[in-house]
């Protein structure tokens, strides 16, 4: 195969790929949003958001406790070193 033939073949592949991409984008845009796959994806994202919110709510007391404990340790070290 010559270089020109390879370049022409590559151009044809690019044109076909671009056409398929445009066709699939058009089909996706034409979707009315009531398809089963879309509703499953929406349910999954809503479930994930709910779980993330629950985990964040459970994490705040732990973070607060660690921060207060760290502050208490620093203050204890500071005042105990001055007392000696």
Curated annotation (Swiss-Prot):
Q: Where are the transmembrane segments?
A: 59-76
Self-association state and partner proteins as the record states: Homomultimerizes. There are several thousands of this protein in the phage capsid.
The organism's superkingdom is given as: Viruses
Q: Which InterPro entries match?
A: G8P (IPR008020), Phage_M13_G8P_capsid_dom_sf (IPR023390)
Task: Name the family the entry cites.
Answer: Belongs to the inovirus capsid protein family.
Query: Where is this protein chiefly located?
Result: virion
A Gene Ontology term for the protein's cellular component: helical viral capsid
- Entry's localization field: Virion; Host membrane
Protein's name in the database? Capsid protein G8P
* The keyword Membrane is assigned to this record: yes
User: So what does this one do?
Assistant: Self assembles to form a helical capsid wrapping up the viral genomic DNA. The capsid displays a filamentous structure with a length of 760-1950 nm and a width of 6-8 nm. The virion assembly and budding take place at the host inner membrane.
Alphabetized UniProt keyword annotations: Capsid protein, Helical capsid protein, Host membrane, Membrane, Signal, Transmembrane, Transmembrane helix, Virion
Mode of membrane association:
Single-pass type I membrane protein
Membrane topology, Periplasmic segments: 30-58
The organism's taxonomy opens as: Viruses, Monodnaviria, Loebvirae, Hofneiviricota, Faserviricetes
Which organism's genome codes for this protein?
Enterobacteria phage I2-2 (Bacteriophage I2-2)
Q: Which residues lie on this side of the membrane: Cytoplasmic?
A: 77-84
Q: What is the annotated signal peptide range for this record? A: 1-29
